[in-house]
Design a protein with these regions (language model features):
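Generic structural signal for residues positioned in beta-strands
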Residues: 2-4, 123, 142, 163, ...
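Extended catalytic core of nucleotide-activated donor transferases of GT-like folds
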Residues: 4-155, 253-259, 263, 279-281
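Short, basic, glycine/proline-bearing loop/turn elements
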Residues: 7-11, 82-83, 122-124, 198-202, ...
Length: 291
């Protein structure tokens, strides 16, 4: 089959995003399918440059990073359109020509018109709760979510009028060579506040900034060190360090796919909290990192 995947790795060319999308791309390719990655800026200042920590219109770093990453996976079909309409690689029309399947993994409907060329269009939701509360376009043939409870009586996530099917992110173990733990700490890479809080039906939902404080004193209760590679707004660094948490720069730990992979390989194990919206809604969130 000819499969087109839409995501946001040029806009956010960080190791964790590359790992997530890359494992889908790699998995489909291993099954013998022709795989194409597409992305569109969609608005001004949409591209993050991890070298400067700034958002802007210059997508050159992201394009170069993604192109090199795809080459490592043995892939070459790629197209990106910046905020001025300039195309890098394939045009959107060319990318979708003859497509059997379009998988939207964060393109946020930006290819709605071009995706009509695909025989089947599906949405894969990686942010259960946020996706449904913000509203979902009705131009997909099927809807999948890593919120395994969404659409059941166990979860309060609104269905937005569609049927949600549970799905697990693929894990390509060959991209992560087995190594003995190099470090002594349990770690995670996280954002304290990646974006603003969300209000739905009179209730406000937050992120990891509302969940991690519940475990603030955990380092004093266990023997192994606990480390947070952390970024985001309003991080209470002094409070966290005072409670015994070791802090690292999340952007440094995830600046590239190799940095991300090496940081994980050097960890004793993953210790993380979910975003508060995932917890409060009993979404059943289960990601590639959960696996």
């Amino acid at each position: 089959m000819r499969i087109v995947i839409g995501s946001y790795v040029v806009r956010f060319p960080l190791g964790g995003y590359l790992s997530w999308v890359g494992q889908w791309l790699h998995g489909f390719a291993r099954l013998g399918h022709e795989v194409t990655l597409v992305e569109r800026a969609g608005w001004r200042d949409a591209c993050f440059d991890p070298r400067t920590g700034a958002m802007g219109d210059d997508c050159a770093y992201g394009v170069a990073t993604v192109t090199a990453f795809l080459e490592r996976l043995g892939l070459s079909r790629f197209g990106f359109e910046d905020a001025d309409g300039r195309t890098y690689g394939l045009t959107a029309t060319g990318a979708f020509a003859g497509a059997d399947l379009f998988v939207d993994m964060g393109a946020h409907g930006s290819f709605a018109e071009e995706a009509e060329q695909a025989a089947v269009r599906i949405l894969v939701d990686g942010e259960p709760g946020y996706t449904q509360m913000k509203g979902v376009a009705a131009d997909y043939d099927a809807y999948y979510t890593v919120g395994l409870n969404v659409g059941t009586s166990r979860s309060t996530v609104p269905t937005a009028g569609v049927e949600w099917r549970p799905i697990f992110d693929p894990v390509a173990l060959e991209l992560y060579a087995p190594l003995p733990p190099a470090g002594d700490a349990y770690t995670t890479v996280m954002s304290w506040q990646a974006h603003g809080r969300l209000e739905h039906d009179g209730r406000v939902y937050g992120q990891k900034d509302l969940e991690l404080p519940k475990f603030l004193d955990l380092p004093g209760r266990v023997r192994p060190p606990l480390e947070l590679a952390i970024a985001g707004k309003h991080v209470p660094r002094a409070e966290l360090e005072g409670a015994g948490w070791r802090l690292r720069d999340a952007h440094a730990a995830s600046a590239t796919f190799d940095a991300w992979r090496d940081y994980i390989a050097g960890s004793r194990g993953e210790l993380a909290v979910c975003k508060q919206v995932f917890v409060a809604t009993w979404s059943g969130w289960f990601s590639d990192r959960s696996a």
